[in-house]
Amino acid sequence: QDRSSAASDVYKRQHIRQSLENLKPVLDENITTIYGLEVPLFSEHLGVAGRCDCIAEFNGVPSIIDFKTSRYIKKKEKISNYFAQGAAYSIMWEERTGLTAPNIVIIMDVDHEKPSVFVEHRDNWTELLHNTIKEYRTRKMFGH
């Protein structure tokens, strides 16, 4: 391993450690029961699969929790794809387990800022999810 690669590894470890320290208060204050971490999910109904970061109770409500990093603060309007992804995980979780996780929580570690936390209800994002899946299949079918 050359010096630049080793230095990069050290930087990444420090960055991960700093992110965890930044997120710790949010996690400690809001998350109670954890149902799963890095949960592999799939849906025959949707025809998609993925791996969910965390399924836990957030402020007492079973929730799909996705962790993101960003160099700058993002507005809710700019992260609709994150909510659609969370809606997919929520549907997959319910299909696989029979348990509902109606909320989608995006916890974003932002460089040099406090973490951003967005909480949305799954049902607000299912239409976008279905449209995204349909668009993906259409593009794939026509080779775009």
What are these regions (language model features)?
Residues A6, T33, T100-A101:
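Short loop/turn motifs at secondary-structure junctions
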Residues V39-F142:
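Mg2+/Mn2+-dependent nuclease catalytic core
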Residues Q1-A7, Y11:
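Single conserved hydrophobic/aromatic residue that forms the stacking wall/gate
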Residues S4, P25, H144:
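Glycine- and charge-rich intrinsically disordered segments
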Residues R3, T33, L46-V48:
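Residue-level preference for beta-strand/loop junctions
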Residues K12-E44:
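A short acidic/basic microdomain associated with nuclease active sites
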